[in-house]
Amino acid sequence: LSEFMEDASNLHEEFYFFGKGNFLLHDRINYELVGKVVKRFLKDNQIDVFYMTSPFDENMTLYRKEWFEGVTVVATVYDIIPYMRKDQYYPRFSRAKQYYEMRIDMLKWVDQILVISESVKQDMIKYMNFAPEKIDVIWGAVDERFKEIPVAAETEKEIREKFGITDSFIICTGGADGRKNLDGLIRAFGAMPTELKEQYQLVIVCKLSQEAVDGFMKLAKESDADGRVICTNFVTDEELLILYNLAHLTAFPSKYEGFGLPVVESWACGTPVLTSNNSSLVEVGGDGAVLVNPNDVSDITRGLVQALSETDLEELLQKGKKRLERFRWKVV
């Protein structure tokens, strides 16, 4: 696609201003005007296929079927987490239910839906009653910037000093969203044998509020892991790459993912993986990762202990690297 875009003679961009805060898109009274703009764009550019890159994005227009007469409409869905976990996500925003379900109605009339895992496809069939033949799986893939690199001794020293990493470490890239299960991971880490906690640190790499950091540090103390859990907060792309390469193990026991990029990013950087036995993670991880039940802290502990003291991590990594080849952009 990138090669096509570089060489295509008729490639151009058009931008439409829908007012401050996209207010034209939020008021139904303006939709006749928006529809005229869309139909003119399709006609003037002789569009055959219209692709919605992210239909649930808050700035995405709520398109109407009648605007696309004679045009094939395709959309990519990355997950349906808010719909599957309504009790958790809908209360966060006053109009979340209306907003989300109006976009589901929009997807009902598009011609074809692309999803990034078989798990998402099955979720849409089960929870939204979509026809299987309307959904095609096109896997997610790892960005080429994630790779094994030599880390100079001075660079490693600087990174370790910046983030307070003194020992071998387990890396987790996630977020404060409870679905990412950082609290479960911290509890599981704290339940490991003392000798393993003395040997390894748990390094949580993601942007967090100070309130979230304080909460995780408090939990670490309560979980008998005081001083062994580090929250880096925001890191640059370069720092993330170095941390992946330096880590002994990636732990990503998320409760649900549409794909699970940290799994393939870790493999690409030469780091073995522990992840969940649910959703897309079991599809992606397969036999190339230690799989755990993310809802069972004791099973996460079991997986950590297995990975750190019982498993041949090099053999596990090689299986992961073999699986990684199907998740590269040149393949998908």
Language model features with spans:
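Carbohydrate transferase catalytic cores enriched for Leloir-type hexosyltransferases
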Residues: 1-332
